[in-house]
Regions:
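Non-heme di-metal
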Residues: 1-188
Length: 188
């Protein structure tokens, strides 16, 4: 499960960059740039990918070379959905997809954080999850603020629903796969 999530974490800054490249709204652009900055940080080693690698270190997993044949179908579909929807030129699609990912992520990182705590991992092992609990909620709230300026525009809500439902369904599939995987291997 950790390897699958690593693949998602690796791709996320690039998906945000795709959203930035297709944005023509200053408020959304500002939010996306702040989001990307929180992902990559000022210094290598303090970016979210490096922090996640610390977590993998505690699990004794080496993901320095992700192996595509180890990725679940659900992981690949989630990545493609984020890539396609974040870089969509329609503001509604982009915002729906971004909100789906950020709001679900806040709940899921909290669950991982709680599970790691219960299983006795040291605090520095799950720092990635600790910092994301509040950050993801802030990002989701920022996206909703932008939506407030657009929701009355023609077709905005329909397009928002398209982006939201596509990414959300891929997230649900991903987390259901993770849950069933955990059950199969008796990992708790």
């Amino acid at each position: 499960m950790a390897v699958q999530l690593y693949h998602v974490v690796l791709g996320f800054p690039f998906h945000i960059a795709g959203a930035i490249a297709t944005s023509r709204d200053e408020k959304l652009l500002s939010i996306l740039v702040n989001n990307l900055y929180s992902e990559i940080g000022e210094n290598v080693g303090k970016d979210h990918i490096s922090i996640y690698r610390e977590f993998l270190y505690y699990l004794q997993l080496d993901c320095s070379r992700p192996e595509p044949n180890r990725l679940w179908k659900e992981t690949i579909e989630l990545e493609q959905s984020c890539k396609d929807n974040y870089s969509n030129h329609d503001m509604g699609v982009k915002l729906g997809a971004l909100f789906a990912f950020e709001s679900m992520s806040s709940r899921m990182v909290e669950k991982w954080h709680n599970a790691l705590t219960v299983n006795g991992y040291p605090n520095n092992a799950f720092r990635f999850f600790t910092i994301h609990i509040d950050i993801e909620k802030e990002h989701a709230a920022d996206i909703l603020d932008v939506c407030a300026h657009y929701y009355k525009k023609p077709n905005f809500l329909d397009m928002y629903e398209c982006g939201l439902s596509d990414v959300n369904s891929k997230l649900v599939n991903f987390w259901e796969k993770a849950y069933h995987y955990r059950e199969e291997c008796n990992c708790y």
